[in-house]
Amino acid sequence: MSKPIVLSGVQPSGELSIGNYLGALRQWQQMQDDYDCQYCVVDLHAITVRQDPKALHEATLDALAICLAVGVDPKKSTLFVQSHVPEHAQLGWLLNCYTQMGELSRMTQFKDKSARHSNDVNVGLFDYPVLMAADILLYGAHQVPVGSDQKQHLELARDIATRFNNIYSPEAPIFTVPEPYIPQVNARVMSLQDATKKMSKSDDNRKNVITLLEEPKSILKKINKAQTDAEMPPRIAHDWENKAGISNLMGLYSAATGKTFEEIEAQYQGVEMYGPFKKDVGEAIVTMLEPIQEEYKRIREDRAYMDAVMKAGAEKASERAAVTLKKAYEAVGFVTRP
């Protein structure tokens, strides 16, 4: 029996955070035995916001090495760089012609990003969701792990797939209509200084973010200065409405140690100050990230291995993507190249 196909991607823009790890990359590793996984470093998406070429080059290799370091196995999963598989851009153009301007103008992420990058509101940023649809539909993905910020884009991909199928092949659909896969994670990873906002690797205030490759001393310092509250006596309780800062730290501690919120509350019942709890949270994060950082350094220094992974992944991805692209091209009437 064939496994359900899953596709997910990670952007090589900025340093990956523990939010990226707990919200996505850790699930990538865990899903490999039960799903046919397609994982990509989405460098085509990254350039919808202006990038320094050298920084993008290094960030792409960094992201690939991190994927490998967290446990993505190229023998179990297809791991590749998006721009190495030209079918993504090719199908993206075709799908543009089956997407309405009004649909794209309603995308909230475009509104948010265009407001933040008002000096460079380019067509690629507007068109981002169509390329994402191509990413998904090329591989016949049954499920796509998405956070709340990407659910609208997945809905658009479903609409495009359904529209194309209804026009050209209602009896034998060319595209699989994907469903969302909502990962069950312990931690809602929020900003360290403002726990009402999601932790973002692109946050200009670096005190809000812990990166996967961050030095232990820096991690401990940031957690020590993280938002808590002024309740007296101090109380460790998981209550997002009234104790967002503490709840955020509890989520991180739970994710790093495997302890439940109930166990954490019992462990720190009757504390006289938040300092010891913060110290334990910081040390738990350092312990969680240490093996990942060590493996990352080993892999990042082995460029021959990384090249081999990229080459094999691109070839495997292209082989599958080419089949879908050929069907779509034939459906619209393109002449097959002799």
Swiss-Prot record:
| One Pfam family from the record | tRNA-synt_1b
For the motif 'KMSKS' region, what are the positions?
198-202
Q: Which reaction does it catalyse?
A: tRNA(Trp) + L-tryptophan + ATP = L-tryptophyl-tRNA(Trp) + AMP + diphosphate + H(+)
Where does the record say this protein resides? Cytoplasm
Q: Which UniProt keywords apply?
A: Aminoacyl-tRNA synthetase, ATP-binding, Cytoplasm, Ligase, Nucleotide-binding, Protein biosynthesis
Primary localization class, coarse = cytoplasm
Kindly list the GO molecular function terms attached to this UniProt entry: ATP binding; tryptophan-tRNA ligase activity
Give a yes or no for keyword Oxidoreductase in this entry. no
User: Which amino acid positions bind L-tryptophan, per UniProt?
Assistant: D135
Annotated Gene Ontology cellular components are:
cytosol
Q: Which GO terms describe its biological process?
A: tryptophanyl-tRNA aminoacylation
| EC number(s) per entry | 6.1.1.2
InterPro entries tied to this protein: aa-tRNA-synth_Ic (IPR002305), Rossmann-like_a/b/a_fold (IPR014729), Trp-tRNA-ligase (IPR002306), Trp-tRNA-ligase_bac-type (IPR024109), Trp-tRNA_synthetase (IPR050203)
Which residues participate in ATP binding?
Q11, P12, S13, G19, N20, G147, S148, D149, V189, K198, M199, S200, K201, S202
Question: Where do we find the motif 'HIGH' region here?
Answer: 12-20
Identify the PANTHER family for this entry.
TRYPTOPHAN--TRNA LIGASE, MITOCHONDRIAL (PTHR43766:SF1)
Its function? Catalyzes the attachment of tryptophan to tRNA(Trp).
User: Mind telling me which NCBIfam families this protein's record contains?
Assistant: trpS
Entry similarity comment: Belongs to the class-I aminoacyl-tRNA synthetase family.
Question: Quaternary form?
Answer: Homodimer.
Q: What is this protein called?
A: Tryptophan--tRNA ligase
